[in-house]
Structure formats: C-alpha cells, structure tokens
C-alpha cells in the first residue's frame, strides 16, 4: 500500500520541513488555506548562510502553522560527519579531489530528527520541498519510514493542485503578497545552494551547463581562491586526533565537536580548501553536476588519512578504501542506517579509527594546494631505521634479502609458465629482444 499522498489531506495534521524560504512559506500558507493543519519543523544544521534561526519558527506561525519548532541538529550532524570521515565514506572523487557527502549526511540527520519530533506531536504525515527528480525525495522517504512506520508522505510539489496554482517562484511570491504578507522575492541566483555545518552544495540552473564553471559561484564557507584579487596567505595548522576523533586545532582542545568543526571551517575556508567540481550519478542513475564546499571536513580528512598511512599496514588501508567507497554509495542513497552500512561503519570505527592518535601539521595555500610538514603519533609503524642506507644496526641483513628473493622464484616460475600457456592459445605474443609481451585480440588464428 502506497504511503504517498497525491492530494492534500484536509483536516489532518501535516508536518512540513520549514526553511523559511519562498517555497516552504508559500506551501505552508497554501496548505492552511486549503484546510490542512500544518505543523512546522525547522532543522538548525548550522547553515553558514543563515543568520537568525529563531526567526524561522516565528515566520511559520505567521504563515499559519499550528505549532512551529526549531530542532537543534548540529551536534548529531557533526557526530555523523566524523563517523563518515572515520570510515572514509566518500565515493565521489575527480582526480583525487573528494566530495565529502555533506548533503547526504545532513539528510540522514534531518530526516530522522524531524520525523522523531513530529511523532512526539502525533503528526504522521510529512511534507518537504524535495522534487521528484532529485535524490532527497528518496532519502527523506527512507529515513522517515525508518523512524515512523506509520508515516504518510505528502509533498506539495507532487500535488497537481498545488502545481497548477503555485507552480513557480513568481506565482508563490504573488500568492503571499495577496494574502497580506510583505514577502519580497529575493533576486534569483544563477544556481541553487543547500548547506549545513559540514559543507555547501551549489547546483542546478546555470551550473547544469558544464561550460559554466566554478567561477560563477560565490562561496559561502570560504574564499573564491581562483580570483587573482583575493589575497590568500599561506598558513600552518596542526590537527590532533585521539582514538580516531579530532580533538584539537593549533593546540586548542575542543570539548564541543560543533565548535571544533566551526573552527576547522574557518581555517580551511580562509584558503578555499575542500572545494570541488563533481559530475555524479544520482540515485536514479541520471548524471548531475555539483560544486561543493567542505573546508573543515577537508582539513580534518587530510590529517586523518595522513595518520592512517603512517599507522596501518597496506592491506588494512586497501580494505578501508574499498569499504569506504561502498559505504559512501550507501550514504548517498539514503541507506546510512541500513544494516550493511552499519557493518561497514562499525568495522572502520573500531579497527581503523581507534588507533588514530597523533598530530599532523599542514601548510595550507590556495584551494586544495597544501603540504604536510610533520606527522607525529605514538602508534606510527613508520620506522626509518628499518630501511636506512647508512651503516649500523639493521632489522634484516643482505643475506636475509637474498633468501626472500630466492623464495620469489616460485611465483616467477609460475608466471613464466602461465605466459607460455597464453602464448600457445594466441592471447599474447611473447617478447623478442627487449619487447614486452603484447596482448592480441584473443581470437585464435
């Protein structure tokens, strides 16, 4: 049985994720006029472009909400962001530059916390502003039903009656003005922005054209590092981790992870660290493009992965990367709390993150240009004396290496025989002189 309501349920409580923007303001007032009982829930996600969170619920009451609540999601959001960092749960990269899944993390927290608040108010119908072509409609759907199995979903943007009356920004603005509200539609940007304390997403409109570059974006978490008139001075920063958790920046320890993330954002933002331009596959498999900011996450991740490479062995690091990519996809798809995601995350937090204690000093320059100046940890397995070319005590001798190389003869012989087998079947041509083996078409002559 479908839990999607295609038409407004009049006379019933309808929870709406209320941002205070034009879309949700018009939707809330429209639902009130049509006979529903709107309950407004606003998530404080530490959005860097929001200046007055307390004013948002007051707006909702003015537009007709029965009640309006502000839910502080910042601490859980930072906690989940650090869990994603510990797990390397990031699968979208271009030439080594990472998207830190900041919007999917935000949706996991928003979806669960707002529906929990609605449940407390006996509200079992939820509406939000996600569109039918995007990822969020599925993310919110999954997280909402995980929290409340009796939840019904009503989205004004899937209701033909709402679309017919208020299908565009101009129509919504006119509707509010005719209803007696002094709502002035803000100048429309060349792209849309969604943000939280972990990062910002810029997408749609002009950014749907690949010929429109990062240059049209005005960062909200840092500087436009690509502009020659923007001064960016090199800066040294030290990040300290204890058992996988970031705890200090430049010698200052933070008991509150929210304050630590805010300071990491300020430091990274001064350089434009963590900005990326990505082409990605949405949940529905259509490709989209986004320009992302995540200065604090990028700073912490650079230090975290440096410690990982100095502490863990190659096989552990390989498994961490493989599992992280899988977990990143699950997170992106709205499956952060699914059993397979919990398994991958728990494994990384327990066996990879726990030994990560130490300090990393970096020099930040412009954008994602930085150098690592020092790495220190009591758990380092990096031991220069093991490989020193100078005379002195050594962990192994030349004779030990001769024995190790002799043992390699076994698999070298196996490889040679396998190449001969491939050559006989026509798959490769054996080398002559200095040539390497060459692949053939694979077809027998």
Curated annotation (Swiss-Prot):
GO cellular component terms, A-Z: cytoplasm
Top-level EC class: ligase
Reactions catalysed, as given in the entry: L-citrulline + L-aspartate + ATP = 2-(N(omega)-L-arginino)succinate + AMP + diphosphate + H(+)
Predominant location category: cytoplasm
Keyword Iron-sulfur in annotation: no
Binding site for ATP: 17-25, 43, 129, 131, 136, 194
Pathways per UniProt: Amino-acid biosynthesis; L-arginine biosynthesis; L-arginine from L-ornithine and carbamoyl phosphate: step 2/3
EC id: 6.3.4.5
A biological process from GO: urea cycle
Domain of life: Bacteria
Record-listed L-aspartate binding positions: 131, 135-136
Chain sites annotated for binding L-citrulline: 99, 135, 139, 192, 201, 203, 280
Listed GO MF terms: argininosuccinate synthase activity; ATP binding; protein homodimerization activity
Keyword tags: Amino-acid biosynthesis, Arginine biosynthesis, ATP-binding, Cytoplasm, Ligase, Nucleotide-binding
Disulfide bonds, paired cysteine numbers: none
Gene3D superfamilies on file: 1.10.287.400, Argininosuccinate synthetase, chain A, domain 2 (3.90.1260.10), HUPs (3.40.50.620)
Location(s), subcellular: Cytoplasm
HAMAP family: Arg_succ_synth_type2 (MF_00581)
Entry's family note: Belongs to the argininosuccinate synthase family. Type 2 subfamily.
Assembly information from the UniProt record: Homotetramer.
Listed name of the protein: Argininosuccinate synthase
